[in-house]
Amino acid sequence: MKLYIVRHGDPDYAADSLTERGRREAELLADKLEKMDFAAVYVSPLGRARETAEAYLRRLGRQGETKDWLREFAPTRFDPDLGHPTIMWDWLPQTWTAEKAFYDREGWMHVPVMEASGVPAEAEWVYDGLDELLARHGYEREGEIYRVLRPNRDSILFFCHFGVECVMLGHLLGISPMPLWHGTCALTTSVTTLVTEERREGIASFRMNSFGDVSHLIAFGQEPSFSARFCETWDCMEERHD
């Protein structure tokens, strides 16, 4: 079975919708996706993800199934460097890397700032929602592997957000989302692909075959959005520092 995880198009966060650029990205993505066969489509309830999904869904006259746990990862923390509450990722590297528990696949969510922000409950909600969905499609979580109840080659499509995508990937790959949040960037309308591997009958794991693919943008000369990235060098004042 294959999982395709899509981040929404270039966002207008204030309006929870897409920018004009984001709508163009979504149409280019739909050009790619409409050539593929998906057994099921799951969508975040947030507007920017729904608008991205709709560019694809309306072409096929089908509907996606909304899953609340696919919303952007919601807990916030107070960031002393910024002086106000912010998301649970985008820490300064010298801050988060100093806490070794952040690298632990289970310990990351139990660092005091995470506990105080309600991260464990939110993360478990995402984990449970994902596992319940995978069981519906024939793969049941058992410890660190998946029991194959119904082996299949279906393709499942998700429209969601970078933060929750990394939480999902951490669960499927057995790693903390912190290095994913801070060491990767799923650009807008990028596609991440995971595939089951059943090397022994009845026992499966997921392998990530590609991360953040934006070939559908590059092929048509669309420069990927800078959204979710930070400045390449300190002296580049045109790019985001915080």
Regions found by a protein language model. Name each.
Residues 73-90, 145-155, 167-242:
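Acidic, low-complexity terminal tails and accessory targeting/binding regions
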Residues 111-145:
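Internal catalytic-core helix/loop-beta-alpha segment
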Residues 1-4:
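Extreme N-terminal starter segment of soluble prokaryotic enzymes
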